[in-house]
Amino acid sequence: MMSKLGVLLTICLLLFPLSALPLDGDQPADQPAERVQDISPDQNPLFHLVKRGCCPYPKCIHVTFCKCC
């Protein structure tokens, strides 16, 4: 039983090596300044639509205070 489990584990590791999994070190660093720019009301037209109470189609489904426009 144990040898079958070992063979199965070996085959799985050969077909899907652990190096194929993304690691946190491979991801770009989170830049707080870029996030602030993304939500700037002057650059994002969604804020103006939200003031009117109307959002474009894909966003109006997930946002409770918006009507679809």
UniProtKB/Swiss-Prot annotation:
Expressed by the venom duct. It comes from the Eukaryota. The keyword Disulfide bond applies. It is found in: Secreted. InterPro entries: Conotoxin (IPR004214). Disulfide bonds join 54-68, 55-66, 60-69. Residues 1-20 form the signal peptide. GO terms for cellular component: extracellular region. This is Conotoxin reg3.6. It comes from Conus regius (Crown cone). The lineage of its organism: Eukaryota, Metazoa, Spiralia, Lophotrochozoa, Mollusca.
